[in-house]
Regions:
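Transmembrane helical cores of multi-pass secondary ion antiporters/exchangers
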Residues: 2-468
Length: 468
């Protein structure tokens, strides 16, 4: 500051060339574009290796690969190796092994490392956010609106209760019991609403129960749960943007999200035939995929413009295009795009999570451990309660239905990722949500095997005896 005041004096500037004064003052080093690209490429190499190793290990023990991608991110992230760290977590260029490697193998100077580190973090974060947009588009594309509308009242009751009970229990418990601020408490409560249909469906198929009464109710409820969960996520993320948690604002956002989703679906029925016809007239490569992505990104932008979340627009686009004759073909073409971008999202969620805040040997970390334990209990009880909302059906295994709704899986990780990106969650709350997602995903398969003790063969024999 003193140097700047001296050099700005008219007397000094009359005798010293301005070019010398300009170089004399300390200027921040500029990041070289080629070095930023090199750091991003090295980050992607690290991300993809971690995602494949983690995914392969989990798939071999009958767990969802996305869980392995998350754990892979934790290993290479701030919690363990420090290969992939981000400025928003409080890390600097000195904490990044990738920056250290670049300084050893390129002409990256220590003075420019900070600028390259910041730029690298921004690029990877944007790719991560694009990955979750593609993921929600893919989920929408795989959803069946007709199936959603045909789901019976029993599945609907299970789904609605399975969203409300953990959301209210988690939010109220964190806010009143632990003194967590309102918006983080609401977001953590919202993360408890998710259900991973893929994990439960796989276990039910292995047990021969997928087509049982309980299996059909679980699958139907999980489909509704996905839609309700995404609406809840969009509303809560919008609350973070506005910073206003008044009842009137919540009602406005809920109505806006619902109206946007319904309006897009209704309007899409008129637009989709035009899009399909346009695709049929095109002769260039990628005509279907690019047209679909234009539609998805446009709706994602519109959702963002009206203070909702981009993922809601992408999900709505998937729902609309799922009703066209191009659905199967589009599903196949989206997979490679998802394979490139979605792992970036899941690995980054893990990499940004500091599990060190849950270290029990540090007294100040015990609050985070208690939060994690509380979220796990509410996550399990809230879904189990939902199974007992089916009345007048003593022949149905209600406990099995509730247990089938427990795993959070990739949907829970989407909540954690969006919460992390928003900056609304404290490190302990974010880590507690991640632990909740991991443990509910791990616990659900063995729990299902306990509440469904009979094998498929036993079930077939029982049905034969009833028939005779």
């Amino acid at each position: 500051m003193i140097f700047a005041q001296i050099t700005s004096s008219p007397v000094i500037t009359d005798f010293i060339p301005l070019s010398l004064l300009a170089t004399a003052e300390e200027e921040p080093a500029q990041a070289d574009g080629s070095l930023i690209l090199a750091s991003v490429l090295l980050s992607l190499v690290t991300i993809y290796i971690a995602s494949k190793i983690g995914g392969e290990l989990c798939s071999r023990i009958n767990l969802p690969p996305v869980l392995g991608e998350l754990v892979g991110g934790v290993v290479i992230g701030i919690s363990v190796l420090g290969l992939l760290v981000f400025p928003e977590t409080g890390a600097t260029a000195e904490d990044s092994l990738i920056m250290a490697f670049l300084q050893q193998t390129t002409d990256l100077k220590p003075g420019a490392a900070a600028a390259v580190f910041e730029a690298q973090g921004e690029v990877i974060t944007i790719l991560s956010e694009l990955g979750v947009v593609i993921l929600l588009f893919e989920i929408g594309l795989e959803s069946d609106l007709k199936e959603l509308l045909q789901v019976g009242p029993q599945a609907a009751a299970v789904a609605v209760t399975g969203v409300i009970a953990p959301f209210v229990g988690g939010t109220a418990g964190l806010y009143y019991g632990f003194g967590v601020p309102a918006i983080p408490a609401v977001f953590a409560g919202a993360a408890l609403t998710a259900t991973s249909i893929g994990i439960t469906a796989k276990v039910l198929a292995e047990l021969g129960r997928l087509n049982s009464k309980e299996g059909q109710i679980i699958i139907g409820a999980a489909v509704i749960d996905d839609v309700l969960g995404i609406i809840v996520l969009a509303v809560v993320a919008s609350l973070i943007k506005t910073g206003n948690i008044e009842v009137s604002n919540i009602i406005y956002l809920v109505v806006s999200a619902g109206a946007f989703l319904v309006g897009t679906i209704l309007l899409g029925r008129f637009i989709s035939p035009f899009l399909v016809g346009m695709v049929n007239e095109m002769k260039t490569r990628g005509e279907l995929l690019l047209t679909a992505l234009v539609f998805a990104f446009a709706l994602a932008y519109i959702a963002t413009a009206i203070e909702l979340e981009a993922i809601l627009g992408a999900f709505a686009a998937g729902l609309v295009l799922a009703e066209t004759e191009k659905r199967k073909e589009l599903e196949e073409q989206v997979v490679p795009v998802a394979d490139i971008l979605v792992p970036v999202f899941f690995v980054c969620v893990g990499a940004k999570t500091d599990l060190g805040v849950l270290n029990p040997t540090v007294p100040s970390n015990r609050e985070g451990l208690v939060l994690a334990a509380f979220l796990i209990v509410v996550a399990i009880i809230g879904k189990v309660i939902a199974g007992f909302t089916i009345f007048g059906r003593p022949d149905i295994n209600k406990l099995a239905i509730g247990v089938g709704m427990i795993p959070r899986g990739e949907v829970g990780l989407v909540f954690a990722g969006v919460g992390s990106a928003s900056g609304a969650l404290s490190p302990s709350t974010e880590a507690a949500i991640i632990v909740m997602v991991i443990l509910t995903t791990f616990l659900a398969p063995p729990f299902l095997r306990v509440v469904f003790p009979e094998t498929a063969e036993t079930e077939v024999e029982t049905s034969k005896q009833e028939g005779s």
